[in-house]
């Protein structure tokens, strides 16, 4: 019996973590990839992601080592007071290209990205993902496409350590702990989505 393998784009946020656990529970061999592009929040985000990987590895033997890849970022996204319309040009194509290249080198035929497709960005919709799929020689899986964040949490968070996830563009480190700012758009989206678990 052949074993399914997948490269999962894993940033340690809600969607990518729920997706990681989804494939682990389905007994896929999961190869997590974190892509660095030089953004201000990445050092703490990656530190938190590595801790989450270690926590998860103790529970799932089918979780492979976390691979950190680096891509060029010609223009840094500056810290902003108002980040509601924060858009990182070509972000998804860069992520998919990096993960796709890694998958091909490993002989893996599938990569997975946790895009929801609900944001009004040109590279964040089902049609774009289909066109992107046609450019690479691996299958691009988008299991949460068309879903809201709270729907992902409600449907796929069982057994997922949501308290260990991080979705923030201004995280801080205090007393050895990484703390989200609580006010950026990513934090607000996360807080709003988590409220649905209490309804």
Predicted feature locations:
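Nucleotide-activated chemistry modules centered on ATP-dependent adenylation/adenylyltransferase
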Residues: 2-199
């Amino acid at each position: 019996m052949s074993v399914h393998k997948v490269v999962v784009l894993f940033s340690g946020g809600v969607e990518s973590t729920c997706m990681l656990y989804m494939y682990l529970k389905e007994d896929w061999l999961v190869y997590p990839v974190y892509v660095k592009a030089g953004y201000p929040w990445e050092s703490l985000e990656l530190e938190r992601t590595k801790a989450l990987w270690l926590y998860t590895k103790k529970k799932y033997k089918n979780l492979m080592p976390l691979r950190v890849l680096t891509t060029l970022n010609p223009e840094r996204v500056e810290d902003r007071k108002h980040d509601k319309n924060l858009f990182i040009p070509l972000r998804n194509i860069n992520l998919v290209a990096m993960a796709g290249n890694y998958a091909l080198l490993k002989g893996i035929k599938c990569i997975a990205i946790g895009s929801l497709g609900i944001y009004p960005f040109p590279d964040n919709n089902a049609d774009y993902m289909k066109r992107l799929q046609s450019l690479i020689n691996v299958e691009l899986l988008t299991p949460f496409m068309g879903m809201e964040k709270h729907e992902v949490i409600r449907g796929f968070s069982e057994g997922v350590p949501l308290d260990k996830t991080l979705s923030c563009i201004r995280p801080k480190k205090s007393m050895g702990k990484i703390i989200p700012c609580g006010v950026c758009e990513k934090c607000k989206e996360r807080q709003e989505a988590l409220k649905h678990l209490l309804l």
